[in-house]
């Protein structure tokens, strides 16, 4: 039982620290909070955290046989290339369109929260790199003796991953929601930030794919 407590806090901390720096999911959560209010930002974070939990479970499953099937990593990286390239262009075009709109949009607090929830799930699902992260984390915990591929171990790992992600996303939502004087500027440039992040992830993925291939 003691190893489950260690497993929970270790996984929670690692998942939380994984998204401390700005990335696709947390920047989108902050953008949602700035444009639609704190409640919608939290709903987005909840949807994204559910997908991250599923990715953590997938990471556990894949880590069991990944060393015998290196083509899995290659396939995930190729899928990531297409996704990042598409969204880098998409957010850049969206930022250009928003730049020419001079009307100030009123914040819609009572927007469709169900749509925001599924948007959080979609954005998190498009980011496939956490699967590799959870694979590596799972392998490290296995070597340390904190996880044993049993039902309770896997359940604790998955739940802790989701909660750690939600905790950091909530901080992003709360932080940007408090900066009321800066939310307009953030909303104005958030699409450029997302486009730049997608471009950066595209370059990183290309490097990793080249490294694996050669």
Indicate where each model-derived feature is located.
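Small-residue-enriched transmembrane helix starts and helix-helix packing motifs
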Residues: 1-20, 42-46, 107-126, 152-163
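Membrane helix-loop-helix hairpins that form the core translocation module of multi-pass transporters
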Residues: 38-114, 175
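Hydrophobic alpha-helical segments of integral membrane proteins
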Residues: 66, 113-117, 121, 141, ...
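Alpha-helical transmembrane segments and their membrane-interface junctions
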Residues: 128-145, 204-214
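Selective transmembrane alpha-helices of multi-pass membrane proteins
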Residues: 69-101, 156-175, 180-214
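Hydrophobic/aromatic residues within the transmembrane alpha-helices of Major Facilitator Superfamily
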Residues: 12, 16, 20, 53-54, ...
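Juxtamembrane transmembrane-helix termini in multi-pass membrane transport proteins
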Residues: 3-74, 137-152
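Select subsegments of transmembrane alpha-helices in polytopic membrane proteins
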Residues: 47-51, 119-133, 194-198
């Amino acid at each position: 039982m003691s190893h489950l407590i260690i497993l929970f806090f270790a996984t929670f901390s690692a998942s939380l620290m994984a998204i401390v720096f700005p990335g696709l999911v947390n920047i989108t959560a902050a953008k949602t909070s700035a444009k639609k209010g704190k409640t919608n930002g939290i709903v987005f974070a909840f949807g994204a955290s559910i997908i991250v939990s599923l990715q953590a479970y997938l990471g556990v499953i894949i880590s069991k046989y990944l060393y015998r099937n290196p083509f899995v990593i290659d396939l995930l990286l190729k899928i990531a290339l297409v996704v990042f390239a598409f969204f880098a262009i998409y957010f850049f075009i969206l930022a250009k369109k928003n730049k020419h709109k001079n009307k100030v949009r009123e914040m819609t607090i009572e927007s469709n929260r169900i749509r925001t929830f599924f948007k959080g799930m979609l954005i998190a699902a498009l980011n496939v790199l956490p699967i590799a992260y959870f694979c590596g984390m799972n392998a490290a915990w296995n070597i340390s003796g904190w996880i044993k591929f049993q039902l309770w171990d896997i359940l604790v790992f998955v739940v802790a991953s989701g909660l750690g992600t939600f905790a950091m996303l909530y901080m992003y939502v709360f932080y940007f929601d408090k900066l009321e004087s800066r939310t307009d500027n953030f909303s104005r440039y958030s699409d450029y930030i997302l486009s730049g992040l997608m471009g950066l992830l595209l370059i990183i993925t290309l490097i990793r794919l080249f490294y694996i291939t050669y």
